[in-house]
């Protein structure tokens, strides 16, 4: 009789497949931008496949009602239910800030430079203005607009150059980021994943083992997305004011 695989074995195999894909790209693709693009596409495709359908996943720029843009984000998790303005111009995707749940920077290695780079890009999103408008449900109109939550920020890598993955250099990088630049979570596929919890001016973090990095990251991401609930409805009139005729 064929043995039924356990949930852990299924995720372990998915993790090995992902590591194999990214490692092969790293070895074979010598052009750095092309290599980076392939890595980003692998992460986007994986999350598109396994996240619930309510969550959209793409590489994108984030825009607000004041006409300001973030840097291009490697991976954006967003919702179109109450924020319908998502533009795709020849592959360049523009998403309103109100519809964003989370943004991730994707790199080959987890190290100080990439951690700081990811923090700066996350900050460029969190600095954008987000509106919130009343919504109408089958049960009636909700007149108290939902307060925008802090967008999740993270980093995804294949491996790390830190000998002690979550040791002193990692902790120093966390402590040196300001509140708006904070990284909440990340996955280093070959070495483990992490979730950081902030309280006032202090923080704590938890990590996974190296053989559970993907399942740990995925389940923690799902949990954080559930905690956020639904994105606020954007104020369509605020965006309309960008046009002279409205």
Descriptions of predicted regions:
Residues 1-72, 77-246:
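Intrinsically disordered, low-complexity Ser/Thr/Pro/Gly-rich regulatory segments
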